[in-house]
Amino acid sequence: MLVLGVVSVNILNGKAEIFTQPEMVLVKAGSFQMGDESGELWEGTRPVHQVILNYNFWIGKYEVTFAEYDIFCEESGKPPANDQGWGREERPVVNVTWRDAIAYCNWLSEKENFQPAYNEAGELLDFNGNVTTDITRVDGYRLPTEAEWEYAASGGHEAVPIPPRFLFSGSDDIDEVAWYFENSGDEMIFTGTPLTVDYSSHGAAKIQGKSTQPVGQKKPNELGIYDMSGNVWEWCHDWYGEYTVGEKVNPIGADFGHLRVMRGGSWIFGANDCRVGNRLYRPPHEKIFRLGFRFARTEME
């Protein structure tokens, strides 16, 4: 059985509370070429540019599961996320908005007595609770920046070979590391009309045969991180913006926008969509059956 963390006991308001600390992987500071010039990927992955991350950070070893998210929902009074009829437990949570994801991160921070990373407006907070754009000063759990996500998916400080990096997170053979359209189940059957499918509310009654899979079943990447290609797309912190030329240091995305970045591809997408250099976006209020998240945290000195 998959174990996602270690159990500790916290004393809150005089009451003993059992809490499962999440399993995370340390990613050490470094630089990499962000983006992908391949003609097989869309223009939004270009131009390739140098990114420097001059700090260490932690990132979730696994995508957040229903088992973990359900505890948050029970304690916070939020309605549970829809599992599409596929089952819960160790499957990655889906049908969560960007704001649901950052609320989970703040809840997790409070569990471990860290300064929450977000205010109600979704702005980053430093370790004193002040709004900041300096990711190195954010104490609590948060969504990974898009740069952190791609660096970690590419193998981070353990990346081999350098260059070139693997096409997918941990391998050039997608079947080794990812659940995607070709291996996520039997032939897909639409029971609704495909041309009128509303993917924002797409349910198990309208699609059968393929689905998400329990986390951690495929080969991990060089850092020991699972499912960064395929299974579910993952929310990132960043507002979506077009890439520009020139070196970037500790980027956190566009200054403002109306679309948040998502990364990694999913069980219902093709191989190219699961490439580490690929990127897409969705409005932060959307709940989608192919989109979940994992969390990150800056290593404090």
Locate the predicted segments by residue.
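Short, structured beta-strand segments at or near domain termini in extracellular proteins/domains
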Residues: 288-301
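A short glycine-rich, aromatic-capped structural motif
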Residues: 18-80, 94-109, 229-230, 295
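Short, flexible turn/loop "capping" segments at secondary-structure junctions
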Residues: 49-52, 84-85, 206-208
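Boundary at the C-terminal end of the N-terminal hydrophobic targeting segment
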Residues: 14-16
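Surface-exposed aromatic
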Residues: 85-94
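Bacterial N-terminal signal peptides
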Residues: 1-8
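Functional-site microenvironments in short loops/helix caps that host divalent-cation chemistry
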Residues: 27, 33, 37-38, 87, ...
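Short Gly/Pro-enriched turn/cap motifs at secondary-structure boundaries
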Residues: 48-49, 205, 214-217, 283-287
